[in-house]
Design a protein with these regions (language model features):
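A nucleotide- and high-energy phosphate-metabolite-utilizing enzyme signature
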Residues: 1-9, 16-19, 23, 99-103, ...
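Metal-dependent nucleotidyltransferase catalytic core
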Residues: 1-18, 32-39, 43-89
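Conserved NTP/Mg2+-binding pocket subregion across the NTase superfamily
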Residues: 3, 61-148
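Short, mixed-charge, low-aromatic patches
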Residues: 13-22, 48-55, 80-87, 114-119, ...
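Short, surface-exposed loop and linker segments with low hydrophobicity and enrichment for Pro/Ser/Thr
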Residues: 20-21, 35-37, 149-156
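Short gly/ser-rich loop at a beta-strand->alpha-helix junction or flexible surface loop bordering the NTP-binding
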Residues: 24-32
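Conserved nucleotidyltransferase catalytic core and NTase-mimicking acidic/glycine-rich helix/loop elements
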Residues: 112-234
Length: 234
């Protein structure tokens, strides 16, 4: 048994105590199950219904979960989940790409995300990220440490952008690093830039002296992703 499954089983026990027969499915997803042992374990739980008393019960366990390196689970009513696939295509698409069933049925069986919903969400996410980088750079006043912090803290979001562009273009496979690199290739982003950002995604530290070197290429990479989405035709 994979080590993270023990923590997932404990979470299922906690949720079963709270929701009893209303608990329908639990899946694990995210960096931890893809090999990043330093990341907290993230899970999605689907239930028949969720009320204030359920939230109170979960809140009592928040500290316990944190101590055991469990992220607060994403808990949704099953029908709410089905109706929100078009509203959160990127978030659900990332779970769909790589997840493992822990309890109940796999909620992603026979689920598909419309490409146009994905394209629209990609455009919003990429252009918002581009504005964030430009504004952040101006706010830094050109100070290397501030630029380094901007690059490091935004690295996970950049990795997500690359994976979403790969998915938009039919990128198969569940391997996180391979899909991320595929997104970079589609946008013509140099492998070295993608490698640097992948490193930061897992270990958000960067020598201050490297910030000025990396930021211009990073900004150009996000601009390239925006062009890919603008010209996408399915």
């Amino acid at each position: 048994m994979k080590p993270w499954r023990h923590a997932a089983a404990a979470l299922v026990a906690d949720l079963t105590h709270i929701f009893a027969g209303r608990l329908r499915s639990v899946v694990a997803y995210g960096p931890h199950i893809e090999g990043d042992d330093e990341a907290s374990l993230t899970c999605l739980a689907l239930v028949d219904s969720i009320g204030m008393s359920d939230l109170d019960a979960c809140a009592q366990l928040a500290g316990h979960w944190e101590r055991h390196r469990l992220a607060i689970p994403l808990i949704l009513a099953e029908q709410e989940f089905r109706r929100s696939l078009d509203a959160f295509p990127l978030e659900y698409g990332e779970i769909l790409r790589a997840h493992e069933r822990v309890f109940g049925d796999d909620p992603f069986d026979q689920v598909s995300i419309r490409q146009e919903d994905l394209r629209r969400a990609c455009e919003t996410q990429i252009k918002s990220h581009l504005l964030h980088l430009r504004e952040g750079y101006i706010e830094s006043g050109g100070r290397p440490q501030a630029i380094a912090d901007l690059v490091a803290t935004s690295a996970p979001a950049f990795g997500s952008l690359l994976r979403n562009v790969a998915r938009l273009n039919g990128g198969p496979g569940a391997n996180r690093i391979e899909v991320t690199r595929q997104g970079g290739h589609l946008a013509g982003i140099p492998d070295a830039v993608v490698s640097d950002m992948l490193t930061l995604e897992r270990k958000p530290t960067i020598p201050t002296t490297d910030a000025a070197r990396l930021f211009p290429q990073y900004l150009a990479a996000v601009e390239a992703l925006a062009r890919v989405v603008d010209t996408w035709r399915g």
